[in-house]
Amino acid sequence: MYFELKENKPHGTKDDPFSTYHIKNEGRSFQIPVHWHDELEIIYVKSGFLTVSISGENYIGTPGDAFVVSPGNLHFMGSQTDTVDYFTFLFPLKYISFCINDMLDDKLLEPLKNGHLMISPRVKDTAKELCEQLVEIYMAKNKKTEPQITAQIKTKIILLQFILPHFKNKL
């Protein structure tokens, strides 16, 4: 059953494996079906209320809340209220790897990828600020006001900043 729930939709491209999805739902309730994927996902609630379920734990996201879905974790999201505006950021962990089998890979990225380590789903503190920066990069990419390589460099720096506090706290 678990393998049947794998999301097979490709995320990103070879040149830019980081994906941003902006979901603005108005006027009706909805639910994204339960699924899992190999990428790490950050869910950021911009406005409204979002029900998020990660590995059987249920949360109610309010404006400014962020959630992390580790690779392989079953999750779904939805809303019973009329309006919610949220973003999801998906990326393979190798996107922020320096591809040299260093301590970052050995102690954090590989264990996350293999399911031996998980980031706590509910994220606090600086998450809102970092997610807002990711939203700004997404908007600039859509408007083509920033070179693609610049957007990728900024995105990777922000993602590393996002993960750093969790690594400091031994996840």
Please provide the spans of the model-predicted regions.
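An amphipathic alpha-helical interaction segment
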Residues: 122-171
